[in-house]
Amino acid sequence: PYGMMNFIDVREDDCYYVDKTHYIPLIENANKYFFYIRPRRFGKSLTISMLRHYYNILEADKFEKWYGDLYIGKHPTPERNSYLIIYLNFAVVNAELNSYQQSLDAHCNTEFNFFCDVYAQYLPEGIKEEMNKKKGAIEQLDYLYKECIKTNQQIYLFIDEYDHFTNKILSEPACLEDYKSETHGTGYLRSFFDTVKAGTDSTIKRCFVTGVSPVTMDDLTSGFNIGTNYSLSPEFNEMTGFNEEEVRAMLDYYATTCQFHHSTDELIEAMKPWYDNYCFSEKSYGGTTMYNSNMVLYFVDNYIRNGGYMPRNMVEENIRVDYNKLRMLIRKDKEFAHDASTIQTLVQQGYVTGELKTGFPAETVAEPDNFTSLLFYFGMLTISGTKRGKTLLTIPNQVVREQLYSYLLDTYNEANLRFDNWEKGELASAMAYRGDWKAYFDYIAECLHRYSSQRDKQKGEAYVHGFTLAMTAQNRFYRPISEQENQEGYADIFMFPLLDIYKDMLHSYI
């Protein structure tokens, strides 16, 4: 079901579940301190939920009920239901660095008290009261893992969205110095992860840490040299998200329980350009690509609620990268070379090349390979092979393309860009249904003239091409495709009509 992240709710309510439990043995055989980066809304939280309950020592009696019909129910691992679980979700921690310590302490204290309550039978008597006498998350965690030695218990630590506060750094450059003080040397965040590291020599036997960016990982864990980042590993390429086989199986199932007016093949044809084509490992390129699981569930949910008709809006609003964050990324992009902007190059030639980094400090995000890597981890780029010894990266699908083209307008003029959305929408409708294309493109030409700087104009055709792509990407009736191949060669821009959604539309354009 769309929006559910609690594994137990999914299982107790007998919801449809895409079985990912065959990754449990792989995780168990990997390094005990496991880092995993994926874009937002890609199934990370549900994965953590599934793992937490699988390893929870208190829930052994529920194993058959929750996991019995899944892969892991038939192939359990030696460590199932053998840990005390500490779960920290940094998404609930205030991202303002000046109040981060207080918020982190409060969240950890709540979770540590919960830990003491539910595992009281496995812990020394009075541990909760003594723990609460300690000051802050660092002292309390240090106390807890040392006390677990007395009862010979092992802890599995899960941290979801460990890099939540990085978003603040990327959107507000003034925060960078505060961030550096918190994540380096004796900073509070750095000290917290140092305490986690110390615990790994004791009773914290496993860690599973997720996020959307490797930036914080490099700053916080440069001394945490026992952990391994598996984000680019081919064996975990399909651990989150859905492959096409999984999407087809889901559609086939719902077609037997709900009213469908399209075949599975027709629905795949409609969804694939929008949600598919993620590849997270160079060694996996040419094999299975991944769909954004959140967007697939959004589509299926809307399709069923529409009585078996395509949703008008293929993009769920919450999937969009936060505007201020991406705007900050664009500014970073322009810092290192305005005329060699990664995003402009990506739009104009359809790809960029670089070396994907598994981590880098926040202050170096503007360096070309680091910036390209950041776009990749945010889900704005996908691996599409190699070129001249570097990783070839392209825009994965129409959802991302629509975002990049829209935000690209900000790279052309950081002053007050304001377009009349109502007027633009009316012109787009006339273009689609009456064939009145001239007024629509006259409007784009007027905007191009009005908002372009002299420096932009000197770029000639490449600038006009990029600006036009950015503007036409906001047309809800078409999907602009750059350099589309046809029998006569290549079209600069092909306006592909979205007939699956607007069946009565009559006009398409090159």
Question: Would you name each region that the model predicts?
Answer:
Residues 1-55, 59, 64-72:
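Walker A/P-loop-proximal flanking segment of P-loop NTPase domains
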Residues 3, 19, 53-117:
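P-loop NTPase motor core
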Residues 91, 160-161, 191, 196-200, ...:
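A short beta-strand-to-loop transition that corresponds to the Sensor-1 phosphate-sensing loop
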Residues 99, 125-144:
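Short glycine-rich substrate-engagement loop in P-loop NTPases that contacts/grips substrate
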Residues 143-150, 178-205:
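Substrate-engagement module of ASCE P-loop NTPases
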Residues 151-182:
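Conserved P-loop NTPase "ATPase switch" module shared by AAA+ and STAND
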Residues 216-222, 230-301:
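Amphipathic alpha-helical segments of the small helical/lid subdomains adjacent to P-loop NTPase cores
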Residues 227, 290-510:
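Extended alpha-helical interface modules used as scaffolds for assembling large macromolecular complexes
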